[in-house]
Amino acid sequence: TSIDRSAKVTLMEDGVLIAPAPYTSASAYYFPTSGRINSVEVLKGPSSISAGPSTIGGAINLISTPIPEMTSGKLVQEFGENGMIRTHANYGVNSGDFGALIEIHDHSSDGFASIANVGGDTGFDKSDLMLKARYESGNHSLAFKYLDLDETSEQSYVGLSQVSFNINPHRRYGMTQYDEMQNDG
C-alpha cells in the first residue's frame, strides 16, 4: 500500500473533515473509534465534490451516535483475551426543542505481541468522551458537538523480516520497546 494512506479519499465524521490539513496533507492518521459510529455514508463520483478536496476516490462520512428521539441509554461491557476490556455507554435526552447525548467509549488491552529479549507492554488504552446538544426553533436549529480522545499505544512502525516472521509472527524486535504513540485530544 502507498504511504499516503487515505490521500485520495476524503474522510469525514458527521460531515466535518477528519484530516488536519486536507489541502496539503490529506492522509489521515486519526480515524474515529468504530464503536462510536452509527452509520457510514459513501459518496462516489460527482456527489463527492461537495465533500471537499481529495475526492478522486470518493468521500466517506462516518456518522456518530445520534441524539435519541426519546430519553434512553445503553451500556455494553466486554472482556476478552490479553486483558481486553471495552466499555461503551451513552445516555441521551430529548424534550421538544432540545436534545442532548453523552457517550463514553473506553477500550484497553495488554497486547498480544512479545518484545524479544526485554519483554514489555504491547497493548493500548483508548478513551473517547463525546457530548452532543441540539436546539431547534421553527425552521432553524443549532447543533454542538464536543469530542475528547486520549490514546496511548505501545505500538511500533517497525516490522519483521520474513525469517523473524516465520519463527514467530507475534514477536517484536527488542529495539522497539520504547516505541509509544500518545494522542491527547
PLM feature spans:
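Short acidic/polar hinge/loop motifs at secondary-structure boundaries
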Residues: 9, 16-44
